[in-house]
């Protein structure tokens, strides 16, 4: 299983070469839109564990990515939302209602 990390600052320890780090909402939207199309064309592709950070630097945040994930579902085993931001509950509830296995988590060990 590959991991997709959407975070403007952090990199987790133990990431594999196939894992993906996205630093802002624009790169996350591009990545997830391509993945959504690929999954729609070839059902059953590799599942991803997705880690989301709310604050992506400056005025950028994860909300537009969450909206996209609700409208264009991604086949994934888990979505983990870093629990250091007050909007975490909204993100988890929104994704859970859309069918994702979403939960609040502490930050994994950083690299």
Residue spans of the language-model regions?
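Catalytic phosphate/metal-binding cores of nucleic-acid and nucleotide-processing enzymes, i.e., regions
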Residues: 1-111
């Amino acid at each position: 299983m590959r991991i997709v990390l959407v975070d403007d600052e952090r990199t987790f320890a133990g990431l594999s070469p196939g894992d993906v780090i996205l630093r802002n909402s624009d790169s996350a939207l591009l990545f997830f839109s391509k993945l959504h199309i690929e999954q729609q064309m070839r059902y059953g592709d590799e599942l991803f564990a997705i880690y989301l950070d709310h604050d992506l630097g400056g005025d950028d945040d994860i909300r537009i990515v969450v909206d996209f994930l609700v409208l264009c579902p991604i086949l994934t085993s888990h979505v983990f939302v870093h629990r250091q931001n007050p909007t975490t509950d909204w993100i988890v509830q929104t994704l859970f209602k859309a069918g994702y296995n979403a939960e609040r988590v502490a930050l994994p060990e950083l690299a």
